[in-house]
Amino acid sequence: MKKKSLLPLGLAIGLASLAASPLIQASTYTQTKYPIVLAHGMLGFDNILGVDYWFGIPSALRRDGAQVYVTEVSQLDTSEVRGEQLLQQVEEIVALSGQPKVNLIGHSHGGPTIRYVAAVRPDLMPSATSVGAPHKGSDTADFLRQIPPGSAGEAVLSGLVNSLGALISFLSSGSAGTQNSLGSLESLNSEGAARFNAKYPQGIPTSACGEGAYKVNGVSYYSWSGSSPLTNFLDPSDAFLGASSLTFKNGTANDGLVGTCSSHLGMVIRDNYRMNHLDEVNQVFGLTSLFETSPVSVYRQHANRLKNASL
């Protein structure tokens, strides 16, 4: 009788093990070989009053095994200055984590920022991923650049934007930092982007809207972006992004601030997510399109892609 009674128990244990096995696999779904480092865009931050710039993304990646670090650089400055600041933090993360390399992911102006690091220190990173980044410039930046340089209008606007950057920096890090909105504008317009690309061409497509080299100097390049400025009527940022999308010429597909073709770098995962520029980092507060995959899921899938590539 005792032997018979063990059979159902054994079956139960076996079934429980089978049921549990997907959970065990899921726990390492985002466990990349090297840590993931996130780099914010213009007027970005790491955390303000408990709210992450990368809303819900770091915790979702960590939950299934990823080692994630969130960086903060100048809210407003040139790609090179921001890149040098990020490089210093990457070197610190490498020392802290004990890993020789990190996977960099940059949103918006964070895209050119991580490209700078990849170009000058490719030994520190196996991959560079850009999300909604204006690698060939932004029509919105070109529109703003029409304000005459040195004019009173430029001085007033740059002063206001610098003040906003200083406030964001203070709320996030306790210091106003150095803000250079004109430096950001020069980096993000078409002419400035072309100059940057001439110095750091790695991963940039040679055609108007194609893909770039998938791998350069040991660094794998990836990108994705959205193409829908208006996605959720409850999201207060949609009104601003809907207005800014009007600066794009000839019906150019865009996310409200960046054209889809300009966002291409290396392997293009996708450039037509139903997301706007802030949806790409799951903002504002996760109010994204109900008819598109969650931005958090996109980051999780990419972490798994990096894992499967042994990165």
Curated annotation (Swiss-Prot):
Binding site for substrate: M42, H109
Gene3D superfamilies in the cross-refs: alpha/beta hydrolase
Family matches, as Pfam families: Abhydrolase_1
Biological process terms in GO annotation: lipid catabolic process
Catalytic activity: a triacylglycerol + H2O = a diacylglycerol + a fatty acid + H(+)
Domain named AB hydrolase-1: residues: 35-280
Active site, UniProt feature: S108 (nucleophile), D255 (charge relay system), H277 (charge relay system)
Entry keyword set: Calcium, Disulfide bond, Hydrolase, Lipid degradation, Lipid metabolism, Metal-binding, Secreted, Signal
One term of GO molecular function: metal ion binding
DNA damage as UniProt keyword: no
Binding site for Ca(2+): D235, D279, Q283, L287
Needed co-factor(s): Ca(2+)
Disulfide bonds: C209-C261
Signal peptide boundaries: 1-26
Subunit structure: Monomer.
Reported function: Catalyzes the hydrolysis of triacylglycerol. Also able to catalyze, in anhydrous organic solvents, intramolecular transesterification of omega-hydroxyfatty acid esters to form macrocyclic lactones. This biosynthesis is dependent on the chain length of the substrates, and the formation of monomer lactone is maximum with methyl 18-hydroxyoctadecanoate. With shorter substrates, monomer lactone decreases and the formation of diolide (dimer lactone) increases.
Protein name, as recorded: Triacylglycerol lipase
Organism per entry: Pseudomonas sp. (strain 109)
